[in-house]
Amino acid sequence: MAAQAVSLLREVARLEAPLEELRALQSVVQAVPLHELREQAAELRLRPLFSLLNQNNREQTALCVSILERLLQAVEPIHLARNLRLDLQRGLTHPDDSVKTLTLSQIGRIVENSEAVTEILNNAELLKQIVYCIGGENLSVAKAAIKSLSRISLTQAGLEALFESNLLDDLKNVMKTNDVVRYRVYELIIDISSVSSESLNYCTTSGLVTQLLKELTGEDVLVRATCIEMVTSLAYTHHGRQYLAQEGVIDQISNIIVGADSDPFSGFYLPGFVKFFGNLAVMDSPQQICERYPVFLEKVFEMADSQDPTMIGVAVDTVGILGSSVEGKQVLQKTGTRFERVLMRVGYQAKNASTELKIRCLDAVSSLLYLSPEQQTDDFLGMTESWFSSMSRDSLELFRGISNQPFPELHCAALKVFTAIADQPWAQRLMFNSPGFVEFVMDRSVEHDKASKDAKYELVKALANSKTVAEIFGNSNYLRLRAYLSEGPYYVKPVATTAVEGAD
């Protein structure tokens, strides 16, 4: 069949409007295994197909794109880079986005190949066209261009090609297209900056990082909201955090939060700014961040008390992130009654908010209450027990009630809360003394979907593997848990049937 494809390709090359042949070729190439096409790669004459893309015939273009998508998979990246450079270049300026997408997918293969990427780095015009693809209307085309340029920049030669040539001017020209395109270029710059301190140095020298930071701390609230997401991405790296601290950016963000009370439009950017500090606290030290920037935790508690679901959601997420580490738990515990009030609000929202916010509350509670076996000191166990009881008059029944609601996502999130505390003795005593709770855990008929069965199994596993459960639940219940565990999450109990003599 591969030979048939080669024959049809020759036929297509001879004709001016080979629609019938293209339809036949499309059927053949989809049917031929890729390894057979690779064996015939040297015989695949692809340039005529690229030429047919330029004839302004929609069906012909669609057929050629479909055929090329398949055939180019059989061609080595180095062959693409060396022998089809001009075709790739023309593909990037083609009016049809499907052709640009095809071309960029092949460039994506080339830049992943250490030998082939050199060919692209030596082709200034091709690089320029990739840069200009960032400015197009089609988002997937722009994203593919950003991805290729990010990959190119992983090497020293790539950094030099992008930042020490006319390409930097092209990048700055593309930014002038509109606000959306400018943010796409910032996205590229942050992607590159996040790789290493050397990459960040190239980006800062270009002036583009400084430009982004000026927009972040400028007066336009919508621009702030967009820029903080990118700056947060940079802060995920150690060298990025160091740079932001040295440049005074973290202090500036803190000051903007301080001034947010007098800004009627702060709702646009506050969630992003608070998330920034939440991520910072987790990646560095919750205690250091909260001590150095007290306004951060102050604002989180204030947002938890808000009537705005967006603000509440961010506060809940941030508390969950902070409380995922022992150090973060200690920081929250030190705030005393302030945090108890937050826990009451979380419990209230878990019961009364929208489904999406309920799930976020439950996820936060799971993070806050979880302790690994080595963390289960008397102090920490006393703390998680106190936190649990602060959420409601009867927190166990609160979460059990949520788990009984007919929404799998809520059911799983509530089971995760029980799993988080399942190996803590105080929680086991609560579960055992709560009427019907042990039966609820053992009852397989409650869960109907895979995710719920998996979540219940994780709860059973956490209980069964606990050192204290046999003593607290009793041996018979412990053996039932072990049996559930050995049967697996999807076990179905056989139903006994009685044969009746004479029945059909």
UniProtKB/Swiss-Prot annotation:
It comes from the Eukaryota. Keywords: Acetylation, Chaperone. The modification N-acetylalanine is found at A2. GO terms for biological process: proteasome regulatory particle assembly. InterPro entries: ARM-like, ARM-type_fold, PSMD5. One of its GO terms (cellular component) is proteasome regulatory particle, base subcomplex. Rich in dileucine repeats, which have been implicated in trafficking of a variety of transmembrane proteins. Belongs to the proteasome subunit S5B/HSM3 family. This is 26S proteasome non-ATPase regulatory subunit 5. It comes from Mus musculus.
